[in-house]
Amino acid sequence: VEIDLASGKIVRTVNVLREPRSAVFSKDGKYLFVTNFLPAQRADLDYVAACVSVIDVNTFEKVKDIQLANGSNALRGLCITPDGKYVYVSHNLGRFTVPTSQLQQGWMNTSAFSIIDVENLSYAGVVIVDEPDRGAAGIWSIACDEKQIYITHSGTHEVSVIDHEAMCEKFEAYPDKSRLDYDLTFLYGLRTRIPLQGNGPRCMVTNENKVFIPTYFADVLNVLDKESLDLTSVPLNPDRTETVEQKGERYFNDAAHCFQNWQSCNGCHPGDGRT
């Protein structure tokens, strides 16, 4: 929806696919990239994945739906690199083609961010943010600057800080990008996982020097220094009392209760816990 700020009226609308969540403009202002939260297709096919819709800002028409890696769902975060070359999309990567008989090494669910080539409006590949023996469940927001990429993990209550330049160099040199879907070692030596205070970090805001990360289930604001990676935390509601319903929702989203933190209930039932 395009809204005239002066009048507050809707000027133009355009349909995407399903449950749009995030949006970002290309650096030249020509395109608007929009995440579709869930796949808009039958779920019993061999390839099931959500798409990023591309809107031509001038005509306000959808020009393309870019489908991500097989199993991509719960598309939440979206950002564009400072040079405008790539768009990063944070999402869950489900392994729906195998029986749900185990959890280790991301057998059922992994967390990832997909990379979209802005110039070609095409899917370039995906980066897994889990480790071989430890998941990074509940991936939510993603942001970047020239130096680093920042990702919140709502299920493991932490933020990942990734060496941006080194990641891009390794990604572009990777010989067969189709194998990235299962590469749990790609970020080895490139990423720092920083535990946060509180429970359930989701959205974040960045400025030149800091990353501000509130926690959804604890009313705690975490402030991360980009240079030193030092963390300070401020309780916003220290006398907060949790209801039974809130406790249940917190458990539903908490991967700390899962073997090696691979997933929470939200991993298979994203959004409002649909089944």
Feature locations, PLM:
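Conserved loop/turn at the beginning of each blade in beta-propeller domains
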Residues: V16, G71, G135, F186-L187, ...
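A short beta-strand motif characteristic of beta-propeller blades
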Residues: K9-V14, E61-Q67, A124-P132, G189-P195, ...
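Residue-level detector of Asp-centered blade-edge/turn motifs that repeat once per structural unit
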Residues: K27-D28, P82-G84, C144-E146, T206-N209
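The canonical Cys-X-X-Cys-His
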Residues: C258-D272
